[in-house]
C-alpha cells in the first residue's frame, strides 16, 4: 500500500520537475518581455497566429505565449503569475486536472491555456458553476485577453439569440455548465443553420471540475414542453403504496438511495391495481417505481417543502429552495399525489443530455479545483484525465485537528456551540459548515440563545453569498454556511486575525466524500495564512449510522461515556476516512453502472444529432430519399406477404392500398401476376422512384430539396421526442426483468436497439408520406410560414429555457427549460389540430 502511495507521489513530483524546466525558460524571457512596449506585446498575438499557420504547434509557442500573458497581467491587473501558476496552466493545456489549494489563484491560471488555445481561432470555453463567477471572470480576466487583442464572450442567464451567437463567436467564452449544455441542445432543435449559436466543441477549462464533472455529472439538462398526460395513475399508486409493508413488499437501500419491489410486492401491486403482469406494463411499472421513491425515499422538509400548495425542491448541497424547478420522469407528480396536492402537468422531454456526456464531446477537456486527487480513478476512467497536484506558492500553516466524536447529535451541537462561543470571545473568526438548511437553522437558534451574532448562508443570491463569504475572515465574525456555499470566493483574513490563529473552520458532519470535507477545510489557510479546522461528528450522523459506527459505539458503551463526553483520536479520524473510502468506491460503482445505461441513450443521440447536422447544413438528400423508398418498399412487401411465397396468398388489397396512400402510385393485382417476392420489391421500388422523379419536376429541384430538409428535420424531431419518453419508461421498468433471471442491462440494450430501429422506420415512412403528397402551392406557403415559425419558436424556446432555471448549478435533480407550446396543445397556427400533428412536425 505504502509503495503504491510512494509511486503516486513520485509520479506527481516527476511531473512537476519536468514542467519546472519550461517554467525556467519562461522566467528567462521575463526581462526581455518587460522591455517590450504595449504595442509590441500586443503584436505577439498576431505573430503567434502567423507562426501557427506556418506549421508551428501550440506546444512550440507555449513558453512565449505564457510569458506574454504573464507580462500582460502584470501591466493590466497588477498581478504576476507565480511559478506554480505557470505549472498549473501547462497542466490545463495538456488536457489534465490541476489540483490547486484554495487561494492559489486558479482564476488567473486559466488565462494562460485559454490564451494559448484561443490562438487557433477555434474557440475556448471557460466553464464556471454560476453566473456571478462567469461574469466576474469575463470582466476581470477578460481585461488581459482584450489587451492582447482577443475577443471575450459571456454566456449567462437571460441573453437573447444574437447576444449568444456573438458570445460564442468570441475567441474565449466564459459561462456556466448549464448554459453551455442548454445551448447545445437548442442548437440541435433548430430548422435553419443560421439559428445555431455554438461552434464546434474545441477546448474547455472547467473550474470546480469535481463539482461539475462528478457531483453533477448525471444531472440531466432537459428542454421540455407540457404533455397534458392523465394524472389518475399517480393518485391510484399513491393510494396503494401506504398499504405495502416495508421489507416485505419492498426493500429500501438507504446507502444506494434506491427502493425496489420484492416478488411478494409485485404480486400485491398487480392485485391491487387489477393488472396481470406489472413487468409487461411499462407505464404502470413507471408509475409504481416513482410512487415508491416518493413515499420511501423523498422526505418532506429535507428533500422538498410544501409551500402554497406546491412541492418546492430543496438543493441537497446548498439548502436553497429551487423555485420553478421540478423533478423529472414523473417523480414530482408522484410527490404531489403523495402530499394530496393538485398534480401539475407532466412535461414532455424535447431534448436532454447529461453534463457527463456533454463535456465528453469536447476535443480537449481540462479542469481545476482544490480537491480532485481522491476522485482521480473516476476522472481517468470516465474522462481520460489524470490529476496533477500543484505545489502551493507558500508553505501550508493550517492545522487540521482530529475529529471529535459524540454519542448523540444533540451532544455534538452543544459542543460546537461552546467552541464557537469561546472563539467568538477571543475574536477569532469561525466558519461553520453544515450539511443542510435544517441543520444550519438548528445551530443558528442555539447561537441566538447564547447571544452570539452570526450570519447564516442559505437561499441567498450569489452576489450576496460571495460578499458574506468574503467577510467571513474578519475579526469576531461567525458564519454558518452549507458545505458547498461560496466556492470560488476567497476568504481574506482581517487585521489582527492571523495572530489569533487565522480562520477556524468547523465541520458539523462528515460528508460521504472526503473531497467535500477537504473543500470545507480549504476555506482556511489560504496562501500560507494560519488557520485551523476540526470536524465534530455524532454516531447519529448519516455517514456514521450507515457505515461503521458499531465499533465506536462499543468503545463508548464500555467506557460508560455520556452524551457530553467526546472521543478524540487520530485512530477515530482514520476509521471515519476508511468509511468514506468505502462509500466513494460504492458511489463510483453506482455511477459507472448508471453510465452504462446512459451510454446507450448517448450513442443514439449522437446518431440522430450527427444526421440532423448533415441535413441542416444542406446535404443533398436525393440519394437518402431513394434509400428510404427502397427500405420502405421492402418492409411493405415483407409485412403484407408474411411467410407466403406466392402473390396470390398475400394480403394484396391492403398492400396495394398502402402503396397508393404512401407512394401515390396505382398498381393492380394483374400487374404483379406470377411475380416472385424479389421481383415485386424491385417493381414497387422502380415505380415509387419514378413517381418521386415526377415530383421533382412538378415542384422544381430547388423547392423539393428545401422541402426535404425542413420536413425531415421536423419528422425526426417529433419521433425523437416520443422516443425519449419511451426510453425513459423502459429504463424505469427494466429492473423488473431481474425477477425473470434476466440481466436488466442486457435487456435494456436489446430493447433500446429495437425501439431505435422502429423509430428510424417510422421516421422514413412519415417523411415519405409527406413528400409524396405535398403540393407546390402549399409547399411554398408552408415553407415561408415554417421559416417564420421556426425563428419565433427558437426565440420562445431560448427565452423560456433560460427563464425557467435558476443561475446556479444543481446536483441530483434535472435542470429543465420549458417552451410554451406543448406537443399536445392546440397548434398556434389555428388549424385545430394538435401541435405535434401540425406545425410540430411538418415544414
Swiss-Prot record:
Q: What is its EC number?
A: 7.4.2.8
The cofactors named for this UniProt entry are: Zn(2+)
The cross-references to InterPro entries, in alphabetical order and at most eight, read: Helicase_ATP-bd, Helicase_C-like, P-loop_NTPase, SEC_C_motif, SecA, SecA_CS, SecA_DEAD, SecA_motor_DEAD
Among the GO biological process terms of this entry, one is: protein transport by the Sec complex
Q: Where is this region: Disordered?
A: 799-834
**GO cellular-component terms in the record?**
cell envelope Sec protein transport complex; cytosol; plasma membrane
Q: Indicate the principal place this protein occupies in or around the cell.
A: membrane
Q: What class of enzyme is it?
A: translocase
Which positions carry the signal peptide feature in this UniProt record?
none
Q: CDD domains, per this entry?
A: DEXDc_SecA, SF2_C_secA
Stated membrane topology is:
Peripheral membrane protein
Nucleotide-binding listed as a keyword? yes
> For this protein, what does the record note about how its cofactor is bound?
May bind 1 zinc ion per subunit.
Question: Which superkingdom?
Answer: Bacteria
HAMAP family with a match to the protein in the record: SecA
Function according to Swiss-Prot or TrEMBL: Part of the Sec protein translocase complex. Interacts with the SecYEG preprotein conducting channel. Has a central role in coupling the hydrolysis of ATP to the transfer of proteins into and across the cell membrane, serving as an ATP-driven molecular motor driving the stepwise translocation of polypeptide chains across the membrane.
- Family from the record: Belongs to the SecA family.
This chain's protein is named Protein translocase subunit SecA
Q: Which organism is it from?
A: Heliobacterium modesticaldum (strain ATCC 51547 / Ice1)
Amino acid at each position: 500500500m505504502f509503495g503504491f502511495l510512494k509511486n503516486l507521489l513520485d509520479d506527481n513530483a516527476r511531473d512537476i520537475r519536468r514542467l519546472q524546466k519550461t517554467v525556467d525558460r519562461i522566467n528567462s524571457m521575463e526581462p526581455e518581455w518587460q522591455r517590450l512596449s504595449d504595442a509590441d506585446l500586443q503584436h505577439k498575438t498576431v505573430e503567434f497566429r502567423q507562426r501557427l499557420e506556418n506549421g508551428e504547434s501550440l506546444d512550440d509557442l507555449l513558453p512565449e505565449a505564457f510569458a506574454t500573458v504573464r507580462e500582460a497581467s502584470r501591466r493590466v491587473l497588477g498581478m504576476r503569475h507565480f511559478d506554480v501558476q505557470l505549472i498549473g496552466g501547462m497542466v490545463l493545456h495538456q488536457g489534465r486536472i490541476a489540483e490547486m489549494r484554495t487561494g492559489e489563484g486558479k482564476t488567473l491560471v486559466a488565462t494562460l491555456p485559454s490564451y494559448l488555445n484561443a490562438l487557433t481561432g477555434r474557440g475556448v470555453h471557460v466553464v464556471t458553476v454560476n453566473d456571478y463567477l462567469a461574469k466576474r471572470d469575463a470582466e476581470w480576466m477578460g481585461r488581459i485577453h482584450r489587451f492582447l487583442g482577443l475577443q471575450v464572450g459571456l454566456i449567462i442567464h437571460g441573453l437573447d439569440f444574437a447576444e449568444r451567437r456573438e458570445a460564442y463567436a468570441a475567441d474565449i467564452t466564459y459561462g456556466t455548465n448549464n448554459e453551455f449544455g442548454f445551448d447545445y441542445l437548442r442548437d440541435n432543435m433548430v430548422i435553419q443553420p443560421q439559428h445555431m449559436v455554438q461552434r464546434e466543441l474545441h477546448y474547455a477549462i472547467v473550474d470546480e471540475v469535481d463539482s461539475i464533472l462528478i457531483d453533477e455529472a448525471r444531472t440531466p439538462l432537459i428542454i421540455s414542453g407540457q404533455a397534458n398526460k392523465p394524472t389518475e395513475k399517480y393518485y391510484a399508486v399513491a393510494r396503494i403504496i401506504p398499504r405495502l409493508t416495508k421489507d416485505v413488499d419492498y426493500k429500501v437501500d438507504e446507502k444506494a438511495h434506491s427502493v425496489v419491489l420484492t416478488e411478494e410486492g409485485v404480486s400485491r401491486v398487480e392485485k391491487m391495481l387489477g393488472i396481470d403482469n406489472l413487468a409487461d406494463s411499462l407505464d404502470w411499472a413507471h408509475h409504481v417505481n416513482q410512487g415508491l421513491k416518493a413515499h420511501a425515499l423523498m422526505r418532506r422538509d429535507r428533500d422538498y417543502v410544501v409551500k402554497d400548495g406546491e412541492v418546492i425542491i430543496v438543493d441537497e448541497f446548498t439548502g436553497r429552495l429551487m423555485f420553478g424547478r421540478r423533478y423529472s420522469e414523473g417523480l414530482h407528480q408522484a410527490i404531489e399525489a403523495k402530499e394530496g396536492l393538485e398534480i401539475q402537468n407532466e412535461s414532455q422531454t424535447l431534448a436532454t443530455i447529461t453534463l457527463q456526456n456533454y463535456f465528453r464531446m469536447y476535443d480537449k477537456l481540462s479542469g481545476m479545483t482544490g480537491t480532485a486527487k481522491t476522485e482521480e480513478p473516476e476522472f481517468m476512467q470516465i474522462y481520460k484525465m489524470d490529476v496533477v497536484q500543484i505545489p502551493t506558492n507558500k508553505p501550508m500553516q493550517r492545522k487540521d485537528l482530529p475529529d471529535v466524536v459524540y454519542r448523540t447529535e444533540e451532544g455534538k451541537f452543544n459542543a460546537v456551540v461552546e467552541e464557537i462561543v469561546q472563539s467568538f470571545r477571543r475574536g477569532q473568526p469561525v466558519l461553520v459548515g453544515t450539511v443542510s438548511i435544517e441543520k444550519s437553522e438548528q445551530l443558528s437558534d442555539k447561537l441566538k440563545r447564547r447571544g452570539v451574532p452570526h450570519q447564516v448562508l442559505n437561499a441567498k443570491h450569489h452576489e450576496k453569498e460571495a460578499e458574506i463569504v468574503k467577510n467571513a475572515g474578519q475579526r469576531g465574525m461567525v458564519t454558518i454556511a452549507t458545505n458547498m456555499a461560496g466556492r470560488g470566493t476567497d476568504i481574506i483574513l482581517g487585521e489582527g486575525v492571523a495572530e489569533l490563529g487565522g480562520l477556524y473552520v468547523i465541520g458539523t458532519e462528515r460528508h460521504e466524500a472526503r473531497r467535500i470535507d477537504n473543500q470545507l477545510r480549504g476555506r482556511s489557510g489560504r496562501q500560507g495564512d494560519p488557520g485551523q479546522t476540526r470536524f465534530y461528528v455524532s454516531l447519529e450522523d448519516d455517514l456514521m449510522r450507515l457505515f461503521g459506527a458499531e465499533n465506536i459505539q462499543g468503545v463508548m458503551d464500555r467506557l460508560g461515556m455520556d452524551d457530553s463526553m467526546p472521543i478524540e483520536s487520530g485512530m477515530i479520524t482514520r476509521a471515519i476516512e476508511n468509511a468514506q473510502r468505502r462509500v466513494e468506491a460504492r458511489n463510483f460503482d453506482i455511477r459507472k453502472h448508471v453510465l452504462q445505461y446512459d451510454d446507450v441513450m448517448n450513442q443514439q443521440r449522437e446518431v440522430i444529432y450527427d444526421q440532423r447536422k448533415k441535413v441542416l447544413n444542406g446535404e443533398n438528400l436525393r440519394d437518402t430519399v431513394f434509400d428510404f423508398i427502397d427500405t420502405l418498399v421492402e418492409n411493405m412487401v415483407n409485412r403484407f406477404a408474411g411467410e407466403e411465397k406466392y402473390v396470390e396468398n398475400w394480403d394484396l388489397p391492403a398492400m396495394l392500398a398502402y402503396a397508393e396512400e404512401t407512394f401515390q402510385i396505382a398498381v393492380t393485382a394483374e400487374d404483379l401476376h406470377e411475380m416472385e417476392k424479389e421481383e415485386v420489391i424491385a417493381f414497387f421500388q422502380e415505380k415509387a422512384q419514378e413517381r418521386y422523379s415526377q415530383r421533382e419536376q412538378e415542384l422544381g429541384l430547388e423547392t423539393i430539396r428545401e422541402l426535404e430538409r425542413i420536413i425531415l428535420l421536423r419528422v425526426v424531431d417529433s419521433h425523437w421526442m416520443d422516443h425519449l419518453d419511451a426510453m425513459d419508461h423502459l429504463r424505469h421498468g427494466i429492473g423488473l426483468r431481474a425477477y425473470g433471471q434476466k440481466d436488466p442491462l442486457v435487456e435494456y440494450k436489446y430493447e433500446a436497439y429495437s425501439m431505435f430501429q422502429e423509430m428510424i422506420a417510422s421516421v422514413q415512412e412519415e417523411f415519405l408520406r409527406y413528400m409524396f403528397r405535398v403540393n407546390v402551392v402549399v409547399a411554398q406557403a408552408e415553407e415561408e410560414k415554417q421559416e417564420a415559425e421556426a425563428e419565433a419558436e427558437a426565440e420562445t424556446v431560448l427565452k423560456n429555457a433560460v427563464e425557467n432555471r435558476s443561475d446556479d448549478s444543481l446536483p441530483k435533480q434535472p435542470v429543465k427549460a420549458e417552451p410554451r407550446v406543448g406537443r399536445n396543445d392546440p397548434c398556434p397556427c389555428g388549424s385545430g389540430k394538435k401541435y405535434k400533428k401540425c406545425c410540430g412536425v411538418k415544414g
